């Protein structure tokens, strides 16, 4: 199932470094989410967590976006 996220942005956790992780932020279903995307693909969510039913598809979509932006 494809999910629709908007205003996706990322930046390295540490200046001038691609690893070990990135700060991510985006909107999903009108809610703003933030977190840390780790090299392993794990997402460490910020203050808000997505619904348990939405999390697998949302994680997959973020992983695809990160592959496109970071590992091109």
From Swiss-Prot:
One matching Pfam family is: DUF5342
- Output the superkingdom of the source species: Bacteria
The record ties this protein, via InterPro entries, to:
UCP037692
Q: Would you tell me the protein name for this molecule?
A: Uncharacterized protein YheE
Give the organism the record lists.
Answer: Bacillus subtilis (strain 168)
């Amino acid at each position: 199932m494809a999910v629709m996220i908007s205003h996706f942005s990322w930046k390295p956790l540490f200046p001038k470094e691609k690893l070990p992780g990135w700060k991510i932020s985006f909107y999903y279903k009108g809610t703003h989410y933030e977190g840390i995307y780790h090299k392993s693909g794990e997402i460490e969510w910020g203050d808000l967590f997505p619904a348990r039913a939405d999390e697998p598809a949302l994680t997959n979509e973020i992983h695809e976006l990160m592959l496109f932006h970071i590992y091109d």
